[in-house]
Amino acid sequence: MTTPSPALSDLHAFLTGAPTSRPVVWVAAGRRPAPDDLPEDALVIAAEELETAPGQELLLREGELDADCEQIVVADALEISVMDYVLASYLPCTGPTLLRLAGDADWDAFLEDADDAVATGYVPDHLLSPLVLLEDAWPLASGDLPAGRCTLTADGASPCLPGAPSPLGRDTGGRPWLPRYLTLVAALRSVRTRDARDVVVSGLGARLGEHAPAELTEDARTAVILRTQDGYRCLLPDTGRFLSLPEQLALLLELVLTLGPDTETLAERTGLSPEQVRAAMSALEEAGILGQAALV
């Protein structure tokens, strides 16, 4: 039996907290909701056969995602290992793996990895593997729990994954840049599937130009600028678009994102004339880059 692709995509989104095209409901063992108790177009992930209404889809699983869960099996076909984040540095993730941030030690290890990545540019392999899913990566980057996610247990309904509250509610310890960090990591993981050679991401251990401040000050979902061996690239997180940029335009964009769009300041930092700066910013606007950054 193979797992339907749309259902697999929605399961992926359920685990990471990403938006889905339909409601996704995880039904804990022992709960037997009636079809009328579920959204009319829901994907229902359950451990046993349940009655569903037209428009609803049932996806059978083994495993409960509780504190002792080490694996879930979906549709008798897809095996997903479940691992505490703190263990990921010691145990290789050789197949589909959900990294959970349920415990204090997991959260502390996650924050330490974030500090190291922002300071040095080193991102752990387990965050760059396309096989690895980080619990609630999307809410941690966006600040919002997904509206379409629901877990039904004996205690009622919750928008969090089974087994623990969302890490979104945890103390970041004075790291307002954490959402931006997750956006940068996602961009680096995406570009590494295209080009495994050395990639430098603006904001992860380095800036691409000498005049940009080192601190992560950009909004979480603004454009991500990268330097690869093939040149400068720009990723628009909300659309997934990759664009090639000339060096001068890429470095100007980095300054706009970190310092703001003041023409005089940008001209002073770059050595360009105000007219040249305005022309370059117009080109970035026309490409949809600054529009996404909400700087115009």
Put a short name on every predicted segment.
Residues 1-44, 97-98, 176-202, 244-296:
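Long, charge-rich, low-complexity alpha-helical segments
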Residues 28, 61, 126-130, 152-153, ...:
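Acidic/polar residues at beta-strand termini and the immediately following turn/coil
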Residues 50, 55, 62-146:
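Radical SAM enzyme [4Fe-4S]-AdoMet core and its adjacent flexible, acidic
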Residues 118-132, 161-209:
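C-terminal accessory region of radical SAM enzymes
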Residues 188-251:
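Acidic, low-complexity/disordered tracts enriched in E/D and polar residues
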